[in-house]
Curated annotation (Swiss-Prot):
Post-translational modifications: By homology to other fibrillarins, some or all of the N-terminal domain arginines are modified to asymmetric dimethylarginine (DMA).
Protein name (database record): rRNA 2'-O-methyltransferase fibrillarin
Example of a GO MF term: histone H2AQ104 methyltransferase activity
Location in or out of the cell: Nucleus, Nucleolus
Subunit structure: Component of box C/D small nucleolar ribonucleoprotein (snoRNP) particles. It is associated with the U3, U8 and U13 small nuclear RNAs.
Similarity comment: family membership: Belongs to the methyltransferase superfamily. Fibrillarin family.
Provenance organism: Drosophila erecta
Amino acid sequence: MGKPGFSPRGGGGGGGGGGGGFRGRGGGGGGGGGGGFGGGRGRGGGGDRGGRGGFGGGRGGGGRGGGGGGGRGGFGGRGGGGGRGGGGRGGGGRGGGGRGGGAGGFKGGKTVTIEPHRHEGVFIARGKEDALVTRNFVPGSEVYGEKRISVENNGEKIEYRVWNPFRSKLAAAVLGGVEQIHMPPGSKVLYLGAASGTTVSHVSDVVGPEGLVYAVEFSHRSGRDLINVAKKRTNIIPIIEDARHPHKYRMLVGMVDTIFADVAQPDQGRIVALNAQHFLKNGGHFVISIKASCIDSTAQPEAVFASEVKKMQADKLKPQEQLTLEPYERDHAVVVGVYRPPPKQ
């Protein structure tokens, strides 16, 4: 039941509040206080759940209560009166991104310095906490609620977007220390499995105004979001097609320098090989994200990665490095390599 009497103004259904309180709206409304409490701390504050739970608490009867947004909701004497607004967005503004706890709220203050990362086009923001960032191609707009950082450089303001490794396999690979991503400014990238365009938007930042990203996504629902991202970013070309049939979009895509693939499909090796035959320059590169459970959920992840690498070699995709994406994703690996390398003299 949770502590029934805990909600200061609890009244009536307060009991249910404790238990039902996790959903914020707390049983019988009385849960306001208790609800706020459950909502607030319940799921570790921050993030999506905490915040929302709290607000629900507000509706449930704690009046403006839960508004404490995950903060201390119910504690504030009047079911949150004190909480009201507290931290606004979920526990103290943490949890920007919802999934994966977001960027953890980039705490920079005034002393943020931007350093170039060894991958061209990627940067590191150094502040109270360090973050991986890319230079915003469309200053003033965000794509998925990520944090933005403005830095003045010789009188001109440059805006950077925090790149969250829990939302992006490529960011996870970069933070995991991948040797090469093969996407320098000005390069052309074919991105298979673009989804809603979260990572695509960062690749668009990295390759910059001279580069191009061909973003292929089969799902119409994600495709809608992708097209909205592409409306603002002139260097993204959205293609709502099945990556298994590259001939369907051959008239849209020129030769590319790099293929990035994040298609969680059992035959993704074949999908990449087909697209490479159509669009990848000889000596061009590929970066493939492999989710072990999507290919064979019964085998050990390591065995799955090894067999995928064997298949690639058979398709003239020559892997050069492989790394796992721990601690950001479980049972994922990224394989980077070269396509039809020129014969050694």
